[in-house]
Design a protein with these regions (language model features):
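N-terminal secretory/targeting leader peptides
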Residues: 1-43, 53-273
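Core domains of carbohydrate- and sulfate-ester-processing enzymes
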Residues: 49-51
Length: 273
């Protein structure tokens, strides 16, 4: 990448686009129905990173980069062309997703379709799929509610898996006092952004409602049943990543426990062996 080669000094992105290099960094994705608070999600992720050195060390040891900030999305939800109020509504319903999050709907009976944000609007318009996993800031930016008028608050959770990195060559040139400032500013930035994301969430929901979307919040009973339909997947996915040489099961367990310490109650408590 441009960062690894030192072409740019600092850059950002999503670990979701690097599943082979950074599979462990999707640990919150493996345990859906986590906190819907971006700020809590960030704090949970930082606690996990703090005791899992493999998460940050890989950037410096293998990719010539330094982690500066972790960034959090608003809660993952579904924009759909029909209401989703029961598990029956999901059966054979075609739903697009980025890939790592498709098991959230496939295990519940839907048909998962690999997609990207850039083609979501046209794919909904032409019927390639009838719903798409996303988040309300994306809904607003891409006007997805024009094609999928039912915005379903599933409660999949706010995920912390975006980043800001600095090229290590650039980092090493900085005096120690400047390095400390960069680290402090990086941590401040991620907290401010998470807080802003949290505050903007309801504003954006209100916006799409004004523009004709119906915002549906699924019942606690449906959320519990949906989470139970995924009960085996977190452990299966962790074991797959374990085999790649990462401490995935340990990290997934830790994520569950840390979320609980931050006050989260899982609708179904996943078991990681």
């Amino acid at each position: 990448t441009a960062l690894e080669k030192g072409i740019v000094d600092i850059g950002g992105g999503c670990y979701c686009f690097h599943p082979s290099e950074f599979p462990l960094h999707a640990f919150q994705i493996w345990t859906p129905f986590g906190t819907t608070s971006p700020l809590k999600s960030l704090n949970i992720a930082r606690d996990v990173y703090g005791v899992t050195p493999e998460l940050a060390d890989v950037f410096e040891k293998k990719h010539n980069q330094k982690l500066i900030s972790l960034l959090t999305l608003d809660p993952y939800e579904i924009d759909a062309r029909k209401p989703i109020r029961t598990m029956a509504d999901l059966q054979n319903f075609k739903i697009g997703g980025a890939g790592p999050n498709l098991p959230w709907v496939q295990n519940a009976g839907a048909i998962g379709v690999q997609t990207t944000a850039t083609i979501a609007y046209n794919s909904l318009q032409t019927g390639v799929y009838d719903g798409v996993i996303g988040y309300v800031s994306l809904t607003v930016a891409l006007k997805l509610h024009e094609m999928a008028k039912y915005h379903t608050k599933v409660g999949f959770g706010a995920m912390t898996w975006l980043y800001v990195h600095m090229a290590m060559d650039t980092w090493k040139k900085l005096p120690p006092d400047v390095q400390r400032i960069v680290e402090e500013v990086g941590r401040d930035f991620e907290e401010v952004l998470a807080q802003e994301t949290q505050e903007n969430y309801h504003t954006r929901l209100a916006q799409i409602a004004r523009e004709g979307a119906e915002v549906i919040e699924i019942s606690p009973e449906l959320q519990k049943t949906w989470a139970e339909s995924l009960k085996d997947w977190p452990n299966q996915r962790a074991k797959e990543v374990d085999k790649l040489g990462w401490p995935a099961s340990k990290t997934a367990k830790l994520n569950l426990e840390v979320a609980e310490r931050h006050g989260h109650k899982w609708p179904h408590r996943y078991v990681i062996e």
